[in-house]
């Protein structure tokens, strides 16, 4: 009987973990925080976020573009993105996030020529970079 209680607690924890991941997916977080929908054909390669009770801190999500998808008219339409160099603040954000999470598929610092789009909302920042050579999007978030 005493063994039953720890087993039930472990099972409850596992259920809460999987239900939480289903409810609070990366895509739902981008929609809730930034109003961005992730189109079909973008495959999440990596995702990192700081553990935080309030959801603040750094996040990094890397998406790979699958063959023959149209991104026209979406947030990820790199034809509408800026090609100018990165600002010092943007480079600092990339360095901070990269140093914190050490992603396997991270972008080179300083990044080679990339397409970029930045959104600022509620004091937070979302920096989206598209690397045409890698055919990947890198989303750097700083939630305050």
Region spans (language model):
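Hydrophobic membrane-insertion alpha-helices, especially the h-region
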Residues: 1-19
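Intrinsically disordered, low-complexity segments enriched in proline/serine/threonine
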Residues: 8, 41, 112-113
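N-terminal export/targeting and maturation segments
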Residues: 13-82
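Extracytoplasmic electrostatic interaction patches
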Residues: 83-144
């Amino acid at each position: 009987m005493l063994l039953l209680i720890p087993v039930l607690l472990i099972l409850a924890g596992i259920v809460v973990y999987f239900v939480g991941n289903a409810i609070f997916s990366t895509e739902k977080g981008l929609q809730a925080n930034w109003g961005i929908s992730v189109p079909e054909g973008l495959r999440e390669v990596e995702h990192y976020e700081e553990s935080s009770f309030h959801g603040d801190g750094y996040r990094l999500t890397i998406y790979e573009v699958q063959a023959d998808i149209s991104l026209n008219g979406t947030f990820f339409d790199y034809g509408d993105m800026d090609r100018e160099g990165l600002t010092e603040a943007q480079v600092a954000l990339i360095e901070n996030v990269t140093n914190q999470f050490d992603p396997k598929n991270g972008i080179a610092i300083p990044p080679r020529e990339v397409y970029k789009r930045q959104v600022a909302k509620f004091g937070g920042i979302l920096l989206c970079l598209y690397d045409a050579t890698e055919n990947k999007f890198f989303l750097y978030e700083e939630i305050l």
